Amino acid sequence: MTNYHFVGIKGTGMSALAQVLHEMNHQVQGSDIDKHIFTEDALRAKGIPFFPFSAENIKEDQVIIQGNAFGDDHPEIARAKELDLTIYHYYDFLGHLADEYRSVAITGSHGKTSTTGLLSHVLSGITPTAFLIGDGTGAGVAEAKAFVFEACEYKRHFLYYKPDYAIMTNIDFDHSDYFTGIDDVVSAFQEMAMQVKQAIVACGDDEHLQNLQANVPILYYGFGENNDFRAENATSTPDGTSFDVYLRDDFYGTFLIPGFGRHHVLNALSVIAICQYEGLNKEEVAARLSTFGGVKRRFSETNFGSQILVDDYAHHPKEISATIESARKKYPDREVVAIFQPHTYTRLKSFMDDFATSLREADATYLCEIFGSAREQEGQVRVEDLQDKVPGSDILTRDNVSILRKHENAVLLFMGAGDIQTYQHQYENAK
């Protein structure tokens, strides 16, 4: 048993990794800011202790897991260096852990977390599976031989991983504070592809993934006719989305997923493809797909009077469009209201026009103050700049959330990667 201390344990990946190690019977604790973050609820439920940041948290018998947002000048890291403790960055440790299993890395600019959650749910019902999901959920299973984990492309961290399999959902330009453009992103994914040891499952509808080179087989999935796994006849039903799957030219089966929207069908296709490649029972896979309850902060619904409140992590223009599409398909007779909090000044500046285009797809739009990051607390852009590009949009503050009451019978989409949840909570508790 090893004694682990996590510096920044409330991070989504860090929280999940802490749970994995805890369930493997290691001693786990961590530290973070005092502010409530949704990931801490799972830590508390599993009895994993966490404390405010302090150099006094660091003890001589610990192995330190350093969160990506914290540098070597952090007081806890500095203390760990003084004590000559073993220190791993999160992504480095995760790479070593994955090497101990038959591993599946899920990566892509969008859809990583939902796809990781879906594959984890399906496999866990068929064979013992450990998993790490980017919504802060993790499970360590003693008898597991498979490990499903989310692999983030930011700063090329996923190059620390050499998985047996990889699912690649799409390639898009994001993280403009690091990547220089789409070619730089494509280059990173190409490097990742060369490290996969068994097979890659990639979305063939994505123009960049179509040109992927690898030393292992690539199975393509999507709606396009040239894909190895192809979805047809996608239909919204009261229970979700039904669709037919063709394996090249042959009918493979009909599947039902609880989600709505093309992106959910694509996520399911990738899972179906890798399960078929591994020889898993098709009926068992279909049964598990139909019972997937989703992941945290991905179209998480709350009934609130006549309204439906949705909490969603969408923080990129394409993710906003996908969330709005899901709302329209699930609730075709309701008004769709977007409440969006931009996450980082750099991202807003880089995608200003795209954000405006996506938000105009809603029936009404409210904008919240920009949420910075640990690396970026201010910038050369204002939320009012986005408001100018979205006709009829309003600025929403925590003091005026009651204005949302006028949207009776509407679906209110609270979207963002910052603290947009505080606006929803304020609205739910407003007198």
UniProtKB/Swiss-Prot annotation:
Record's subcellular location: Cytoplasm
Molecular function GO labels: ATP binding; UDP-N-acetylmuramate-L-alanine ligase activity
Reactions catalysed according to its record: UDP-N-acetyl-alpha-D-muramate + L-alanine + ATP = UDP-N-acetyl-alpha-D-muramoyl-L-alanine + ADP + phosphate + H(+)
Entry binding sites for ATP: 108-114
E.C. numbers: 6.3.2.8
Pathway in which this enzyme or protein is active: Cell wall biogenesis; peptidoglycan biosynthesis
Swiss-Prot/TrEMBL keywords: ATP-binding, Cell cycle, Cell division, Cell shape, Cell wall biogenesis/degradation, Cytoplasm, Ligase, Nucleotide-binding, Peptidoglycan synthesis
GO cellular component annotations of the record: cytoplasm
Function text: Cell wall formation.
Family of this protein: Belongs to the MurCDEF family.
Protein name, per record: UDP-N-acetylmuramate--L-alanine ligase
Gene name of the encoded protein: murC
